[in-house]
């Protein structure tokens, strides 16, 4: 696996490499990330990963400096997964001057996760566009676990006419249904036992809608009540349209149920397509 930090070296390394599939990460990799690398192989000739902890997407109450940096272990995992090229820029490489030009997503950045993490999706969209310009891939993989992020990137790519196919990678789960996340490591043993409740409740919402329930607000409120009774502190449980995460206009269009809630001090997110 080649490792490059400079944009010029990266572009030189990617000449004549066929169809390039790009998987951006912030490092601290787990099996969910590695699954994206494996899925990417089926969509192109060359798989490029990136590791960059992006300061722009951290909010005022989110500690950029405490984000785990596990670079050597990440490199070993990526090489074992068959990644061809790793782009690992420093802040000076990617932001050689203050980033005064940014990507401002529309209203989607202010709902759901965006309501609780103001400015987050502006930072995500800006760094992803910049990484796209560095790598110049033909396709890019983003996990469906971060569903709102996937929609922001997919819609940005379409509206800015970027020649990149955005592919949603399926969420990898533990045997009990908990979505794999670096945050799971912060759960106590008791919290880890409780954590799959979030996915079970999303499954119950999907089952109810498929069985004919049309009152999505009632389903949301029932799930919130169940989480609260079990000691969770909820940000949201929401049923939305898949395409743009707007409020559902009936239950016949493709929908997604999404949730974000805190178990102890750990904020967990999950979703399920309906």
UniProtKB/Swiss-Prot annotation:
(R)-pantoate binds at residues 57, 149. GO terms for cellular component: cytosol. Beta-alanine binds at residue 57. Pfam families: Pantoate_ligase (PF02569). Pathway: Cofactor biosynthesis; (R)-pantothenate biosynthesis; (R)-pantothenate from (R)-pantoate and beta-alanine: step 1/1. Its main location: cytoplasm. The active site is at residue 33. Its EC number is 6.3.2.1. It catalyses: (R)-pantoate + beta-alanine + ATP = (R)-pantothenate + AMP + diphosphate + H(+). One of its GO terms (biological process) is pantothenate biosynthetic process. InterPro entries: Cyt_trans-like (IPR004821), Pantoate_ligase (IPR003721), Pantoate_ligase_C (IPR042176), Rossmann-like_a/b/a_fold (IPR014729). GO terms for molecular function: ATP binding; pantoate-beta-alanine ligase activity. ATP binds at residues 26-33, 143-146, 172, 180-183. It is found in: Cytoplasm. HAMAP family: PanC. Catalyzes the condensation of pantoate with beta-alanine in an ATP-dependent reaction via a pantoyl-adenylate intermediate. Belongs to the pantothenate synthetase family. The reaction proceeds by a bi uni uni bi ping pong mechanism. Homodimer. PANTHER family: CYTIDYLATE KINASE/PANTOATE-BETA-ALANINE LIGASE (PTHR21299), PANTOATE--BETA-ALANINE LIGASE (PTHR21299:SF1). This is Pantothenate synthetase. The gene is panC.
